[in-house]
Amino acid sequence: NGGGNYTEKNMTLAIDGSLKRLQTDYIDLYQLHWPERNTNYFGKRNYNHDIKEKKWNDYESVLKALKKFVDQGKIRYVGVSNETPWGLSKFLEISQALKLPRIVSVQNPYNLLNRAYDIGMSEISCRENVGLLAYSPLAIGYLSGKYRNNQIPKKSRIGMFGDFWTRYKEDNAKKAVDDYYNLAKENGLTLTQMSLSFVNSRPFMTSNIIGATTMEQLKEDIGSVEVELSDEIIEKINLIHANNP
């Protein structure tokens, strides 16, 4: 967790600690939370290569350590999070060559305002059968509509913790939210329902990681699984996205 040292010793401490806290014998899916190398994750749009950076090439040792945990029965499957096409490809390449545990999932952000996953990761997901566990499907609440017209509810995440997700405050993002809101309303849907249903419809999607602070929000989120977007709505969503990248 936290892009820390993925040594066998550190991962052993982390896994044993998790097993103890969870009071369970094994973990179904164990994911590496952050890439240990320098890369463009968590809101960074571009990769800035640092020639002075110490080269990180411990894929083999990390996978070998994970294999020990699988063999010991502590974990069953392994995944990554906040990964890039290059990083995921390296893990897959080395695991196949050395017959080590294969990455089965990647937990990255994905929503109507952040479709970076579509560019390179989606093809790898589909062709290599690595499912996306999409986090922030409502863009930290922007796609619920509660921040429209510069409103900031006191008990919202931004109201309590401030807003450092600058990409969602840009003018084109605000316009996109308004356009998505109107499209949902025209089709008898809430913005939340349409946003989550779109995420659910993607061919590379394995799990849509929703978040809710009230029972009403939870019911609306869960209800999105009953919503099936028409081809026409999908086409209009893609048009809004093209006009507000």
What are these regions (language model features)?
Residues 1-10, 50-57:
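Active-site mouth loops of central-metabolism enzymes
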Residues 7-21, 63, 88-93:
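Short, acidic/polar
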Residues 11-28, 120-129, 233:
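Short amphipathic alpha-helices and their capping/turn segments at secondary-structure boundaries
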Residues 35-239, 244:
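Beta/alpha (TIM)-barrel catalytic core signal, keyed to glycine-rich beta->alpha loops juxtaposed to Asp/Glu
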